[in-house]
């Protein structure tokens, strides 16, 4: 029996094509994945992300616990509501999951972790909490809706009360604020501006309907994947997992090495990997016909690699991919497509931001 979100009925009403997503019955699209993709790049789209796991970490040692748990350092978070992105690593330096953490104060934080890894993550959070004065509470009573695109904030704001409008006024990217019954964050997984909004589950349907009435287009997991790949954002389980170092997943920027005395889970292994050198995650661009896909082999001058994520980019009109390759890769590589080797260009793993190509 698959799990459903508080918005399941709304998806069916809208004629969504539903698929099983790690035990959740979720919309893959509502008719046209390409149209949904363009709506987010050009106007405003919304995603049901209620399957994500919301976890509150509170207690006298909440900060110390998260400093030990995460490769990125929550000590950087000084302002109320400021968020950061981090990997949660195992002792071998592999990625248990990637997540966002919001800082309310040094005794109160909120994490948003992936749904596919929920059980594993909860067990990991609990096991690492031993010896720390913290309580870890999952918050399934919230639904979560991501409203993304150049007009997303403006359209979402038509639903906000005066106090909520005031709370988000001038809010910079990567912040979250509790404003009356909504938790509103300037985060997302598309490379566009917008909000991720946590709403009490019993209000989710009416909130979704009000967004529809404001002209926000519902979008499924299909468009979510092409948007995040254009933005060069990793998908857990594909671009990295427990066997992959963040250094080999374009996540080096999420590791806080200083102060050297901060011990975090996986630090020793990471230091050895940094010393020895690892593979790296790069972007690939192919302007010929055909689509680069996950799992395709990549040949470079310094050895073999593999495509971790690949798709047709609706914004650019050709195929893009992310690939893990030896670190001294050249400007081009070869990819095996339909039994022949095709030369493709190597770029930084980011293709589109705020509706524009960054290639």
Curated annotation (Swiss-Prot):
GO BP term, example: glycine decarboxylation via glycine cleavage system
Transferase keyword on record: yes
Catalysed transformations (reactions): N(6)-[(R)-S(8)-aminomethyldihydrolipoyl]-L-lysyl-[protein] + (6S)-5,6,7,8-tetrahydrofolate = N(6)-[(R)-dihydrolipoyl]-L-lysyl-[protein] + (6R)-5,10-methylene-5,6,7,8-tetrahydrofolate + NH4(+)
InterPro entries documented for this protein: GCS_T, GCS_T_bac, GCST_C, GCV_T_N, GcvT/YgfZ/DmdA, GcvT/YgfZ_C, TrmE/GcvT_dom1
E.C. numbers: 2.1.2.10
Domain of life of the organism encoding this protein: Bacteria
Entry similarity comment: Belongs to the GcvT family.
The protein's name in its UniProt record: Aminomethyltransferase
């Amino acid at each position: 029996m698959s799990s459903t979100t508080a918005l399941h009925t709304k998806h069916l009403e809208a004629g969504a094509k539903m698929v099983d997503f790690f035990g959740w019955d979720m919309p893959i699209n509502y008719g046209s994945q390409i149209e949904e993709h363009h709506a987010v790049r050009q106007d405003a789209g919304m995603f049901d992300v209620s399957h994500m796991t919301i976890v509150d970490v509170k207690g006298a040692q909440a900060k110390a616990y998260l400093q030990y748990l995460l490769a990125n350092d929550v000590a950087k978070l000084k302002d109320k509501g400021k968020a950061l992105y981090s990997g949660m690593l195992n002792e071998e330096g592999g990625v248990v999951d990637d997540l966002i953490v919001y800082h309310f104060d040094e005794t109160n934080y909120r994490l948003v972790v992936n749904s596919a890894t929920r059980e594993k993550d909860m067990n990991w959070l609990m096991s690492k909490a031993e010896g720390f004065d913290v309580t870890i509470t999952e918050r399934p009573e919230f639904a979560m809706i991501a409203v993304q695109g150049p007009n997303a904030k403006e359209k979402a704001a038509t639903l906000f009360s005066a106090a909520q409008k005031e709370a988000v006024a001038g809010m910079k990217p990567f912040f979250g604020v509790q404003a009356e019954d909504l938790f509103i964050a300037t985060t997302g997984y598309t490379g566009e501006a917008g909000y991720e909004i946590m709403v009490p589950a019993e209000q989710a349907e009416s909130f979704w309907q009000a967004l529809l009435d404001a002209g926000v287009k519902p979008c499924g997991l299909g468009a979510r994947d092409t948007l995040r790949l254009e933005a060069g954002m990793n998908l857990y389980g594909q671009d990295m997992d427990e066997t992959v170092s963040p250094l080999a997943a374009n996540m080096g920027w999420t590791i806080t090495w200083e102060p050297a005395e901060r011990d975090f889970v996986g630090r020793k292994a990471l230091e050895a990997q940094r010393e020895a050198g690892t593979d790296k995650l790069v972007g690939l661009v192919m302007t010929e016909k055909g689509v680069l896909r996950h799992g395709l082999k990549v040949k470079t001058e310094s050895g073999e690699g593999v495509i971790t994520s690949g798709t047709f980019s609706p914004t650019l009109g050709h195929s893009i991919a992310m690939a893990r390759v030896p670190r001294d890769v050249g400007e081009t590589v070869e990819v095996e497509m339909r039994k022949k080797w095709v030369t493709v260009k190597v770029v930084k793993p980011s293709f589109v931001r705020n509706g524009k190509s960054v290639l």
